[in-house]
Amino acid sequence: MAKKSMIEREKKRIKLNNKYTPKRNTLLQAYRQTEDFQSRLDIHSKIQKLPRNSAKNRIRNRCWKTGRPRGFYRDFGVSRHVLREMAHSCLLPGVTKSSW
């Protein structure tokens, strides 16, 4: 189980990302379309003034049950340990244990 503070930090990052994504996208689009060097610097400084945790690449996928950041399966939203437990207890429809 991950620390509660880490899980809350991720929730805060997701909230900040949702809040600042439109503003960040408009600034980035203006930055790409501008050819003047000075105006590019101005736009770049505005982008840098946005909160660091509002960037999308700061968000880490975490298991919804345990908060584990590694061994994460996107299709199910859980870590490998939880996926195995849920598959064995038939909580995931259509998932079967492979045998060959």
Curated annotation (Swiss-Prot):
Keywords: Chloroplast, Plastid, Ribonucleoprotein, Ribosomal protein, RNA-binding, rRNA-binding
Gene3D superfamilies: 1.10.287.1480
GO terms under biological process: translation
GO molecular function: rRNA binding; structural constituent of ribosome
UniProt subcellular location: Plastid, Chloroplast
Annotated Gene Ontology cellular component terms: chloroplast; small ribosomal subunit
Disulfide-bond pairs as recorded: none
InterPro entries associated with the record: Ribosomal_uS14, Ribosomal_uS14_bac/plastid, Ribosomal_uS14_CS
NCBIfam families assigned to the protein according to its UniProt record, in alphabetical order: PRK08881.1
HAMAP family per UniProt: Ribosomal_uS14_1
Assembly with partners or alone: Part of the 30S ribosomal subunit.
Family per record: Belongs to the universal ribosomal protein uS14 family.
Function: Binds 16S rRNA, required for the assembly of 30S particles.
Protein name: Small ribosomal subunit protein uS14c
Gene source species: Trieres chinensis
